[in-house]
UniProtKB/Swiss-Prot annotation:
This is Delta-actitoxin-Cgg1b. Gene3D superfamilies: Anthopleurin-A (2.20.20.10). GO terms for cellular component: extracellular region; nematocyst. It comes from Condylactis gigantea (Giant Caribbean anemone). The modification Hydroxyproline is found at P3. The keyword Coiled coil does not apply. It is found in: Secreted; Nematocyst. Binds voltage-dependently at site 3 of sodium channels (Nav) and inhibits the inactivation, thereby blocking neuronal transmission. It comes from the Eukaryota. Belongs to the sea anemone sodium channel inhibitory toxin family. Type I subfamily. Pfam families: Toxin_4 (PF00706). One of its GO terms (molecular function) is toxin activity.
Length: 47
């Protein structure tokens, strides 16, 4: 999957570890949205 930044990863600075995964639509069952950004077409999720 495509990595994305969770709030727990810290500020969006180049070089930070991206612990989330982009899901089109909403997060898969058993996953949760991990940031507060509002995206219409995808969510940043983690297990």
């Amino acid at each position: 999957g495509v990595p994305c930044r969770c709030d727990s990863d810290g500020p969006s600075v180049h070089g930070n570890t991206l612990s989330g995964t982009v899901w089109v639509g909403s997060c898969a069952s058993g996953w949760h949205k991990c940031n507060t950004e509002h995206n219409i077409f995808h969510e940043c999720c983690k297990e």
